[in-house]
Amino acid sequence: MPLYRYKALDAHGEMLDGQMEAANDAEVALRLQEQGHLPVETRLATGENGSPSLRMLLRKKPFDNAALVQFTQQLATLIGAGQPLDRALSILMDLPEDDKSRRVIADIRDTVRGGAPLSVALERQHGLFSKLYINMVRAGEAGGSMQDTLQRLADYLERSRALKGKVINALIYPAILLAVVGCALLFLLGYVVPQFAQMYESLDVALPWFTQAVLSVGLLVRDWWLVLVVIPGVLGLWLDRKRRNAAFRAALDAWLLRQKVIGSLIARLETARLTRTLGTLLRNGVPLLAAIGIARNVMSNTALVEDVAAAADDVKNGHGLSMSLARGKRFPRLALQMIQVGEESGALDTMLLKTADTFELETAQAIDRALAALVPLITLVLASVVGLVIISVLVPLYDLTNAIG
């Protein structure tokens, strides 16, 4: 069985640091609870030399998404166990493996010990914690339900991270497939095909038009391969720079939404983000207008962000959220209907979270369907291109062999 390291609080509030063999981290937590301890952290042990994980070495900022989720969950657990806030932060300060995270937690603890609320301490971390995070903590402080607020916040962050990871993971295999076959095609055109071109030129044989075309492309790739390699990189840098231009990005995002397949996927994904954020904020007591202002910052499509900004103005003037979002005609009808039901029933936060569940599931299913169709299509197209190149250079050789025979 794998070896796990754990940190736990005993009945006297002292931190225990140890190891045990278990099938999974849930078993470690259960065995610690049976011993009367409160599990704070469980993770697979590193190698014998205690070397840090690659993820820790590559982390550039104190808290990545996974670390922020872990920090929030652990803080909720400690507060729920009756630990004072400054004591809980002191315990958490010893858990991270990197010095940057320890310094951040220490600074937050010192600010709290100075009499400031947690939300103010987080706000002083120069943008490390999002407005959503800070406002939810502030709402929890006002409502006296810090543990529940932190647990909901951890759940929100975990769901957001999982959805983002789903999208990224779906793109990895097609990207690798394109890269591998693209390199093989470049090698075929830039090295193999020119060998045939020289051979046919020395034999002075008549070639079909399609063979001549492939040989010309092969010679072009051989002579200008460096330019052909650099062009995509330059184009990518140009597009990245253009996307920073507000007008260009707005036009591009609006155009993407009008595309049948990708536009529908983007709309579902952004709807899930918006409704998950709004529902979580409203459930924690953040006013609707403030929640809308925060929620639009988690969206990436500028066209939909503009629709949400316009909806905020309408809500300010007394209109309902569903009707205000409907004016842009970009959000899915089902989402608008579910939001309207929530407004009419007085359970807007609940319906927003249910809407998020629905569209997160739809997004995941849409990605799976797209991937199931895209990978075979890419494979078929690239295999056909490679096959046509091979056939086009071998057909004249076959004809020549038959003529000699």
UniProtKB/Swiss-Prot annotation:
Residues 191-218, 392-405 are periplasmic. Its main location: membrane. GO terms for cellular component: plasma membrane. GO terms for molecular function: metal ion binding. InterPro entries: GspF/PilC, T2SS_GspF/T4SS_PilC_CS, T2SS_GspF_dom, T2SS_GspF_sf. Residues 1-169, 240-370 are cytoplasmic. GO terms for biological process: protein secretion by the type II secretion system. It comes from the Bacteria. Keywords: Calcium, Cell inner membrane, Cell membrane, Membrane, Metal-binding, Protein transport, Transmembrane, Transmembrane helix, Transport. It is found in: Cell inner membrane. Coiled coil: none annotated. Ca(2+) binds at D98, Q151, D155. The chain crosses the membrane at residues 170-190, 219-239, 371-391. Component of the type II secretion system inner membrane complex required for the energy-dependent secretion of extracellular factors such as proteases and toxins from the periplasm. Belongs to the GSP F family. Type II secretion system is composed of four main components: the outer membrane complex, the inner membrane complex, the cytoplasmic secretion ATPase and the periplasm-spanning pseudopilus. Homodimer. Interacts with XpsE and XpsL components. PANTHER family: GENERAL SECRETION PATHWAY PROTEIN, PROTEIN TRANSPORT PROTEIN HOFC HOMOLOG. This is Type II secretion system protein F. It comes from Xanthomonas campestris pv. campestris (strain ATCC 33913 / DSM 3586 / NCPPB 528 / LMG 568 / P 25).
